UniProtKB/Swiss-Prot annotation:
It comes from Ovis aries. The keyword Acetylation applies. Keywords: Acetylation, Cytokine, Cytoplasm, Glycoprotein, Inflammatory response, Mitogen, Nucleus, Phosphoprotein, Pyrogen, Secreted. The modification N6-acetyllysine is found at residue 82. Acetylated within its nuclear localization sequence, which impacts subcellular localization. Glycans are attached at residues 102, 141. Cytokine constitutively present intracellularly in nearly all resting non-hematopoietic cells that plays an important role in inflammation and bridges the innate and adaptive immune systems. After binding to its receptor IL1R1 together with its accessory protein IL1RAP, forms the high affinity interleukin-1 receptor complex. Signaling involves the recruitment of adapter molecules such as MYD88, IRAK1 or IRAK4. In turn, mediates the activation of NF-kappa-B and the three MAPK pathways p38, p42/p44 and JNK pathways. PANTHER family: INTERLEUKIN-1 ALPHA (PTHR10078:SF33), INTERLEUKIN-1 FAMILY MEMBER (PTHR10078). Residues 1-112 form a propeptide. The similarity among the IL-1 precursors suggests that the amino ends of these proteins serve some as yet undefined function. One of its GO terms (cellular component) is extracellular space. Gene3D superfamilies: 2.80.10.50. This is Interleukin-1 alpha. The modification Phosphoserine is found at residue 87.
Length: 268
């Protein structure tokens, strides 16, 4: 996701190596000064720690946010934490979930000084099942099937799709991500797809029940992305890796070619 460049910070860094920074900055034109003053005006206290619409007039008391409007989350000291699209007044539909997975314009903006433990201390809350007993076919039209050698999966061309693994896709939500995290549970079981390191086979992890909250077990979570007709599953625990297939190889985690990372979801 693209980050919004901090133009004022870049300007300061550029001048920081010059002893004449203080005097030079005073010679900026009034137009330049007014630009920065307008762009970095202090945030009013009544806007701290609140969602604010970028498109709705702040003086309107009757305006309401729709699903497609942009909102921003800011901290008490005015730092922008996140820009995302969401609804504050309607139930999220399947079309909305598809829009989140397919939206390449949304951005996450986090403070540069945010500590790692702060960014990783995220809770993912169960939302609902969005696909039941679906099949995953890769770009070569191979279906994912169970591998009898262990808790693994592989891809094969099937004449009978009843032999393919059926998955239930469960959606989760958190306050820290604008993408759509999901789990892939083998239908009619409590076995969940679990991401491993690069080039290592994904595993089945048995859970006593479908987790209502996921905090430490992020290997079970994948950001579902949709580009055109193809679907991608990016690991939350390993954000550069995707579920992938490859000829004569178990289903594994990979960053891209020569492994195949694009899939087509086939409904029951």
């Amino acid at each position: 996701m693209a980050k919004v460049p901090d133009l004022f910070e870049d300007l300061k860094n550029c001048y920081s190596e010059n002893e004449d920074y203080s005097s030079e900055i005073d010679h900026l034109s009034l137009n330049q000064k007014s630009f920065y003053d307008a762009s970095y005006e202090p945030l009013r206290e009544d806007h701290m720690n609140k969602f604010m619409s970028l498109d709705t007039s702040e003086t309107s008391k009757t305006s309401r946010l729709s699903f497609k409007e942009n909102v921003v989350m800011v901290t008490a000291n005015g730092k922008i934490l996140k820009k995302r699209r969401l609804s504050l007044n309607q139930f999220i539909t399947d079309d909305d979930l598809e829009a989140i997975a397919n939206d390449t314009e949304e951005e996450i903006i986090k403070p540069r000084s945010a500590h790692y433990s702060f960014q990783s201390n995220v809770k993912y809350n169960f939302m609902r099942v969005i696909h039941q007993e679906c099949i995953l076919n890769d770009a070569l039209n191979q279906s994912i099937i169970r591998d009898m050698s262990g808790p693994y999966m592989t891809a094969a061309t099937l004449n009978n799709l009843e032999e393919a693994v059926k998955f239930d896709m469960v959606a989760y939500v958190s306050e820290e991500d604008s993408q759509l995290p999901v789990t892939l549970r083998i239908s009619k079981t409590q076995l969940f797809v679990s991401a491993q390191n690069e080039d290592e086979p994904v595993l089945h992890k048995e859970m006593p029940e479908t987790p209502k909250i996921i905090k430490d077990e992020t290997n079970l979570l994948f950001f579902w992305e949709k580009h055109g007709s193809m679907d991608y599953f990016k690991s939350v625990a390993h954000p550069k890796l995707f579920i992938a297939t490859k000829q004569e190889k178990l289903v594994h985690m990979a960053s891209g070619p020569p492994s195949i990372t694009d899939f087509l979801i086939l409904e029951k």
